[in-house]
């Protein structure tokens, strides 16, 4: 191989490594046996009764059938048979690789209600036009979840975008710091909505032009301050404003950085697709 070819290959590897280290979806890929004390970044311990729409989506690889199902992503209960999560949580998988656990404060263990995923429908426009664009998927489960309005409850889907600056709540079992261990106990954090125009400016020089904010996304975070955010393991989970599901945890530059708000799938914008899938269209 010529020196110029070798240098070209090296540059490609370095650029790939840079991309993988920054614009990652907030997907869990950690050792589930290690849970240090701490919080979701900048957040607090919560109880499932405060966020009864929250589920843990557990997964195992087809190549390792002997392994237990383990937390991969979060999700939200739409009704007793329907869960909303992120497309990047389910891409390249089949339904039998997942179980949904509702009504639990913990990402491990057998408490709560466990049900099977029977069908996975990922947005056909995922990653089209921008990285992580249309990052949403619908899961159908069976047997149906026993909704009880206390620890297992459906959440209303937004039909209008939230106001800039509106307070929102994110919950999940994600890392308590970038690249750190996930939390075994359910955590939550409160962050304001950031307008898409400002958020797009923040990500203007991030990696390359494929990383930009589209209408199918919304942003939230303490802009210019940081310190509060979703993180790895929170993917697919809920962002809630005034008791309505407005966002699905999607991606960002690391976690809780002051100049990079977290990015979420925009439920109100994607609502026609969600409704069509639920109607079987």
From Swiss-Prot:
PANTHER family: AT26814P-RELATED, POLYSERASE-RELATED. It is found in: Secreted, Extracellular space. It holds the Pfam family Trypsin. Its EC number is 3.4.21.4. It is an enzyme of class 3 (hydrolase). Residues 1-23 form the signal peptide. One of its GO terms (molecular function) is serine-type endopeptidase activity. This is Trypsin zeta. It comes from the Eukaryota. One of its GO terms (cellular component) is extracellular region. GO terms for biological process: proteolysis. Residues 40-279 form the Peptidase S1 domain. Keywords: Disulfide bond, Hydrolase, Protease, Secreted, Serine protease, Signal, Zymogen. The record marks 229 as: Required for specificity. Disulfide bonds join 73-89, 199-219, 231-255. It catalyses: Preferential cleavage: Arg-|-Xaa, Lys-|-Xaa. The keyword Transmembrane helix does not apply. Belongs to the peptidase S1 family. The keyword Hydrolase applies. InterPro entries: Peptidase_S1, Peptidase_S1_PA, Peptidase_S1_PA_chymotrypsin, Peptidase_S1A, Trypsin_dom, TRYPSIN_HIS, TRYPSIN_SER.
């Amino acid at each position: 191989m010529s020196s110029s070819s070798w240098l070209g290959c090296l540059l490609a590897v370095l650029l790939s490594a840079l991309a993988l280290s920054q614009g990652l979806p907030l997907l869990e890929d950690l050792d589930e046996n290690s849970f240090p004390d701490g919080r979701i970044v900048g957040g607090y311990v919560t109880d499932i009764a405060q966020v009864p729409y929250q589920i843990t989506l557990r997964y195992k690889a087809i190549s390792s059938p002997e392994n237990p199902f383990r937390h991969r992503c979060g999700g939200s209960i739409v009704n007793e048979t329907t869960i909303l999560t992120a497309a990047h949580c389910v891409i390249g998988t089949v339904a039998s690789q997942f179980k949904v656990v509702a009504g639990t404060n913990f990402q491990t263990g057998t408490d709560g209600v466990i049900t099977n995923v029977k069908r996975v429908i990922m947005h056909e426009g995922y990653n089209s036009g921008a990285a992580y664009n249309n990052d949403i998927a619908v899961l159908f489960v069976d047997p149906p979840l026993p909704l009880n309005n206390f620890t297992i409850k459906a959440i209303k889907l937004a039909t209008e975008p939230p106001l800039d600056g509106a307070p929102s709540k994110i919950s999940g079992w994600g890392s308590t710091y970038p690249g750190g261990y996930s939390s075994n106990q359910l955590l939550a954090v409160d962050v304001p909505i950031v307008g898409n125009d400002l958020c797009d400016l923040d990500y203007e020089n991030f990696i390359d032009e494929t990383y930009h904010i589209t209408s199918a996304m919304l942003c939230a975070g303490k802009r210019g301050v940081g310190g509060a955010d979703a993180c790895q393991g929170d993917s697919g989970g809920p962002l809630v404003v005034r008791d309505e599901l407005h966002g699905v945890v999607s991606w960002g530059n690391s976690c809780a950085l002051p100049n990079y708000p977290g990015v979420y799938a925009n439920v109100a914008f994607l609502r026609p697709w969600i409704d069509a899938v639920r109607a079987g269209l």
